[in-house]
């Protein structure tokens, strides 16, 4: 089941996403987040987390770095500054404007 869901997301990333304008306000993108959540938390919890992330991604939020947390939650990652890609995390969360 997990491989099927990851395959469906990859089909979306390869064939559907390129013809749509970029709208994701987060890093990693919602489709990459879904794949990471499926790998980290399995088919059921990963799918729920991925869908919750898609619902959070809308024009009324700021966005930013939101990696998949190590535990199941429907909320945004409370410690995005600990993201493994420090350069990207700093770019999104620096105090400089």
Swiss-Prot record:
Q: Where is the signal peptide?
A: none
Q: Sorted alphabetically, which keywords does the UniProt record give?
A: Cell membrane, Membrane
- What membrane topology term does the record carry? Peripheral membrane protein
Which InterPro entries does the entry mention?
Answer: Membr_insert_effic_factor_YidD
Coiled-coil stretches, from where to where?
none
An example of a Pfam family matching this protein is: YidD
Per UniProt, subcellular location reads as: Cell membrane
Q: Which residues cross the membrane?
A: none
GO CC terms for this protein?
plasma membrane
Function statement = Could be involved in insertion of integral membrane proteins into the membrane.
Record family assignment? Belongs to the UPF0161 family.
Q: What is this protein called?
A: Putative membrane protein insertion efficiency factor
The record lists the organism as Lactobacillus johnsonii (strain CNCM I-12250 / La1 / NCC 533)
């Amino acid at each position: 089941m997990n491989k099927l869901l990851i395959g469906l997301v990859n089909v979306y990333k390869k064939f559907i996403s390129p013809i749509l304008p970029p709208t994701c306000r987060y890093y990693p993108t919602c489709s990459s987040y879904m794949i990471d959540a499926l790998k980290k938390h399995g088919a059921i919890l990963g799918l729920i987390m991925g869908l919750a992330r898609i619902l959070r991604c809308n024009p009324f939020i700021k966005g930013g770095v939101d990696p998949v947390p190590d535990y199941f939650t429907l909320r945004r990652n409370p410690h995005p500054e600990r993201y493994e890609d420090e350069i990207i995390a700093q770019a999104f969360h620096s105090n400089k404007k």
